[in-house]
Amino acid sequence: MRRTFIKKEGVVITTLARYLLGEKCGNRLKTIDELATECRSSVGLTQAALKTLESSGAIRIERRGRNGSYLVEMDNKALLTHVDINNVVCAMPLPYTRLYEGGLKAQFDGIPFYYAHMRGADIRVECLLNGVYDMAVVSRLAAESYLTQKGLCLALELGPHTYVGEHQLICRKGESANVKRVGLDNRSADQKIMTDVFFGDSDVERVDLSYHESLQRIVKGDVDAVIWNVVAENELTMLGLEATPLTDDPRFLQATEAVVLTRVDDYPMQQLLRAVVDKHALLAHQQRVVSGEQEPSY
């Protein structure tokens, strides 16, 4: 009987810890009856689970009688030990640039962490919202368009040039003023937005193509230009192409910044990111990978 109680209390502790991770110090907590209903347990078992969390030092609650109970202190790392996180799966872009091979995994020491590489921010966000993955890496530019929907939280921002170096308009040498057909991979939210920003209402035809074949399609004459993550200049020269910097709009800079999205109600994952990710160490790791000083973590 006692072992059954312990098992049930453990389930309630996990549910309470997930709830508390979404609260802030100073917040009035739900009543014990409300918490018992959410935990699908008795009032007595819920009270016992709450006291266990208090005894462990994860939280401190101030009880003010009829005015309710208030969360006075909380230790996010301690609460996370009570949350059943078996592994973490992060949806990532395809690693065609070494910036994507940086050290996010290295930050999750002791927690099984896996990447799922997928082309197109739309599909990464869709899988995140459907509960297939725990978090997704996209550009800030794409994130801003997704955050107009409900259900997403911007949990981590890494700053400019952490997603890609920069995007430029790639075209045949000397043809930048004669663009009539521009290539566009409709799976790339960034490319769609930047193409619309750059060309505006100009009479330029959008031609659907895969992102990775963009340069060859320009060389063949299928399209005149494409907005693309800049490659080595000597490669463009060999292909008879040139690159024009994208300026005069802050959205072009937003497209270079990596951010991490979670589901808005996944408080444990948001707190886990805040608790374990050292942004300075992450960016330093990323630069070592880019320079070839360190092997990427997969």
Regions found by a protein language model. Give the residues of each.
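C-terminal regulatory/effector modules of DNA-binding transcriptional regulators
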Residues: 119-122, 129, 134-298
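Short, hydrophobic-biased segments on the C-terminal half of alpha helices
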Residues: 50-51, 125
